[in-house]
Curated annotation (Swiss-Prot):
Domain of life: Viruses
Leader sequence segment: none
Organism: Autographa californica nuclear polyhedrosis virus (AcMNPV)
Keyword vocabulary terms for this entry: Apoptosis, Early protein, Host-virus interaction, Inhibition of host caspases by virus, Inhibition of host innate immune response by virus, Modulation of host cell apoptosis by virus, Protease inhibitor, Suppressor of RNA silencing, Thiol protease inhibitor, Viral immunoevasion
GO terms, molecular function: cysteine-type endopeptidase inhibitor activity; cysteine-type endopeptidase inhibitor activity involved in apoptotic process
A Pfam cross-reference name: P35
Protein name: Early 35 kDa protein
Functional description taken from the UniProt entry: Functions as an inhibitor of the host RNA interference antiviral response. Inhibits the insect host cell apoptotic response initiated by the viral infection. Blocks as well the activity of members of the caspase family of proteases. Required for late and very late gene expression.
Length: 299
């Protein structure tokens, strides 16, 4: 997820992949496919990142399905049917510009102090939108204690066309941290909807963060008395799994004495201990938590 404006823009499920390129560099692929048939004005999108961006490239839409299938494969195993490029610098801020997008990356404190000026450099001048974004979105992006970087992306009309709607960011993480950008814009309800999958490699397991997130999840409403939402914290030799699932029981068609237990809507975190890869699936769930997941990298 990310902080996106205007809020009426219809986007598909968010897909995130963050992978190590070398000891100093990682690549973040952040996919929010625009579902609106035609953009009539620029879309503003921001998310936290743990270091400065060094390059931005567009990639083919097919990458979305490849990343999603890797994550889905891990969670499908839980659901058993039967169970026992640089454009220039302005104000010391690096900008990357293309015909259909404009990207900059700066510390949160810099963004806060020069917010309108930075957006103007992106040719984003809608005064009402800037004021609303500053009120509802900026507070979730600026962490005064840690002063994380913020990627500012302006997607221009025409970006939604063609086969290259995927943006890839090569960046240099600072402090051996990786930020998985789940935070939303602030709303008045206090509940936040999540529809995102993520694949992150070369990171350490953080059970405390994952437990907090999963315990806060509200799964889709039950329609049968036999349905239960259950919390799992499981570990094996190769994996650690923290997730919630909807379980229910059905009777066998051969006789009422036989019962089948079903597990569906598995949502949470799976960590592969051998490959050091984190898989995240938060599909159509809500939570009172509105935050990023911040992980330590493998040194």
């Amino acid at each position: 997820m990310c902080v996106i404006f205007p809020v009426e823009i219809d986007v598909s499920q968010t897909i995130i992949r963050d992978c190590q390129v070398d000891k100093q560099t990682r690549e973040l692929v952040y996919i929010n496919k625009i579902m609106n048939t035609q953009l009539t004005k620029p879309v503003l999108m921001m998310f936290n990142i743990s270091g400065p961006i060094r390059s931005v490239t567009r990639k083919n839409n097919n990458l979305r399905d490849r990343i999603k299938s890797k994550v889905d494969e891990q969670f499908d195993q839980l659901e058993r049917d039967y169970s026992d490029q640089m454009d220039g610098f302005h104000d010391s801020i690096k900008y990357f510009k293309d015909e259909h997008y404009s990207v900059s990356c700066q510390n949160g404190s810099v963004l806060k102090s020069k917010f309108a000026k930075i957006l103007k450099s992106h040719d984003y001048t809608d005064k009402k939108s800037i004021e609303a974004y500053e009120k509802y979105c900026l507070p979730k992006l600026v962490d005064e204690r840690n002063d994380y970087y913020v990627a500012v992306c302006v997607l221009k009309p025409g970006f939604e066309n063609g086969s290259n709607q995927v943006l890839s960011f090569e960046y240099n993480p600072i402090g051996n941290k990786v930020i998985v950008p789940f935070a939303h814009e602030i709303n008045d309800t206090g509940l936040y909807e999540y529809d995102v999958v993520a694949y992150v490699d070369s990171v350490q397991f953080d059970g405390e963060q994952f437990e907090e997130f999963v315990q806060s999840l509200i799964l889709p409403s039950s329609f049968k008395n036999s349905e239960k939402v259950l919390y799992y914290n499981e570990a094996s030799k190769n994996k650690s799994m923290i997730y919630k699932a909807l379980e229910f029981t059905t009777e066998s068609s051969w006789g009422k004495s036989e019962k089948y237990n079903w597990k569906i809507f598995c949502n949470g975190f799976i960590y592969d201990k051998k490959s050091k890869v984190l898989y995240v699936k938060l599909h159509n769930v809500t939570s009172a938590l509105n935050k990023n997941v911040i992980l330590n990298t493998i040194k």
